[in-house]
Amino acid sequence: MSAIPRTSIIMPVYNTASTVIAAIKSVLAQTDPNFELLVMIDGSPDNSVQLIAEYLQQNPDERVRVFNNPKNQGLSAMRNQGLDEARGEWVTFPDSDDALYPTFLERLHYHAERTGAQVVNCAHNMVATDGSTTQRLKGTPGTLTGQEAAFALLKDELSPYAWDKIIRRELFEGVRYPQIERAEDECALLDCYLRAQSVTVIDEPLYAYAVSAGSLTWSRITPLNETRRLLEYFEKSLQRTSTYHLPAGQEALTIARVIAYLNNAQQALIVGGESAPAVLAGCRTGFTVSDALLALRIRPVFGAAGLLLKTSTALYRLLYGAYVKRVYNL
């Protein structure tokens, strides 16, 4: 391995004993061998530590470094520790229950060199519980400015995930994943995009994302206060740059507000429980009809959903349930 690897692959591990070895194998099978793998064990209560140790003892690889944190600290803390330890020029953050396809690094770096982008996003395959796959790409293939990418991210026109892209590590100087209970990926990515010169999107599925009910955002109800903290984070990120007062910036923040409360409402409707009615009521008042009408013009699906949530939660529940079944095959 070169003194400075091209890519640092940061993989948090928590309660994924059944999948983590396959995830590690998918990294070690990369056609681009110039990487380091940082395995960040987050106080995992299962036998992940033992399985990883046994595998690496049988298959030693100098590119792999394991950090065994006995106390659970959360996903953001693990990624931040990985960033502190990373030596690569680029970083990526696969989950330990997913898999990289063999050419993940090779193809993303090819497009980075071709376009000069500081972030390259790829498509991914969603692998359902029955083994079927569906290709998904959020965004239009091509290259955007960092500002354009930031606004597109807020409007849900680009992938908000940490695992389907490579990012120049220099963009994380002064940037870390916040301790927020939802969308911490999107928060850090927004800050990176606001620093980036250009961002490229490619229509090549290079990542396999395992879909399960527990892995989706509606597997639990996020407290309303966390949604407010998320929106405050978005606003402060734009305020630190010249983008906050731009009309496009304000539009993006408005649409992000509608989307954030829609997502929170979806959790309440699907999960249910004692807290659901209060959360649902807070989501319905979290954005205005004017906000929804603006979203209707720019992001029609979200605008229509926002207006529907404000007028008929029963119909909204029915339509969203049909959407989940169609998209995720659950």
Where are the model-predicted features located?
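Sequence-pattern detector for short linear motifs
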Residues: I9, G82, G139, A150, ...
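Catalytic-loop motifs flanking and including active-site residues across diverse enzymes
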Residues: A188, L230, R257
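Catalytic core of nucleotide-sugar-dependent glycosyltransferases
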Residues: L206-S212, S219-A248, L262-D291
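Amphipathic alpha-helical repeat scaffolds of TPR domains
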Residues: L253-N263
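Membrane-interface aromatic/basic loop that binds lipid-linked glycans or pyrophosphate carriers
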Residues: L269-L330
